[in-house]
């Protein structure tokens, strides 16, 4: 310890900087600094401390930590009582911690249920026990969890500016840079303005591009009604092929040939996303983890791969030949080419492409996997889908307008998104003192004070299964409910407010097109895994057992 203190004493604190942001100028009187007082205390007491055992020092240190926690909470409570925002707010129901200091019991339960693939069910059951909004304390940091649509509306819309992305930026930034999913404030506004024009109908309605990759997918699926096929992995490959085609004008072709470079990118992208998901799961312990060298290399492979396409797009803009010699992309519009017309910032283009690729691959694959999981267990729904497609399309592939008119098909999509939202749980962080409209008091209907720095967790998975919102059969797959009911903030598969998903129409169009073409191609679909649904939660939700089915051709 003496060595550490000596280093602190000798360190030139004026040399500190945060990237390009210089550190604040030190106080002119170093005697008033915390570091100086620590050093002075050590100089005075280091000799006397040598007589005490390590255990005694450890106990004293732990006691000091507990006292510090108690003092912090007392000061926070005093601040909360006197905050003008808190007038009218009532206490929030708290999770019944056994460890009231660090909240390790709460953390342990989360870790164990996650490993058992029951994390979302545990969250849902907690809401049923504690109420739709409750508080926790972990490592002396306050958190609020909610499945209340009014509170979620407040977080995402009404008081949108009161919240930031929290820890998402340091975790996802190494791969996604300054893209739309990892930016706040002006950076985020710039990203959204840059990307919005590229999700116009002309881009979203390119069904021929989807059909091209779907044809490759269908070639890999036996139609004899006897062979078992695992659809979940095929859907991931399909959405990666179609998303890269949509974004880069060049598909990875993971369902067919694919070059070695394309395959390397696909593998690196999957590894990078797994590493990001792991960091989110680790939470506060992420700082103790050694950097994963393979994951860091994967980040660089992904960014370098996309940079090659950005260079080609900029060359096309300036009338130069493609560095890759790819002639297939020059005559049609695609996302990257349009983006390159809007900005010269190559790093920004690369970052935005990687951000959209995550949504284009993972969320749509999650939806398709969950959709076919439930359809394989509801043959009567499958026959209704086939009947609607046959009546309205007469065996032809649908165009964009026809697709929009297939009401029962859309109801099946909505019902799947309700039960299995691709992003079932999300977080924000309060950037200032603010309030939630509900959750306080004995009945949970009074406003709640939210201090600056508080982590907000909102769980659409639990909200979508609330019987008071969706009826006593909320846990059941029943597409017919969408024929008579309309939902607002109770149904939130694509987020809401200013940050609502830009690509939701693309995802819905692609999923509906795939569903219709499958219904036209296969007479029956049968589940081949009798096990109940078990969650696999990474960045998106999937079935831990996959989607094993048998399909019989029409």
Swiss-Prot record:
Residue numbers binding heme: 501
Cofactor dependence: heme
Keyword Metal-binding found: yes
Pfam families named among the record's database cross-references: p450
Keyword presence, Iron: yes
UniProt-listed Enzyme Commission number(s): 1.-.-.-
Glycosylated position list: 110, 328, 414, 425
Top-tier EC class: oxidoreductase
Highest taxon in the source lineage: Eukaryota
Protein's pathway: Secondary metabolite biosynthesis
Membrane topology category: Single-pass membrane protein
Any GO CC annotation of this UniProt entry: membrane
Spans traversing the lipid bilayer: 52-72
Cross-referenced InterPro entries: Cyt_P450, Cyt_P450_CS, Cyt_P450_E_CYP52_ascomycetes, Cyt_P450_E_CYP52_fungi, Cyt_P450_E_grp-II, Cyt_P450_sf
Function: Cytochrome P450 monooxygenase; part of the him gene cluster that mediates the biosynthesis of himeic acid A, a ubiquitin-activating enzyme (E1) inhibitor. First, himA, together with the trans-enoyl reductase himH, catalyzes the formation of apolyketide chain, which is then condensed with leucine by the NRPS activity of himA. Dieckmann cyclization and release from himA gives a tetramic acid intermediate as the product of himA PKS-NRPS. HimG then catalyzes alpha-oxidation of the tetramic acid ring, with a subsequent rearrangement to yield apyrone intermediate.
Descriptive protein name: Cytochrome P450 monooxygenase himC
Organismal lineage: Eukaryota, Fungi, Dikarya, Ascomycota, Pezizomycotina
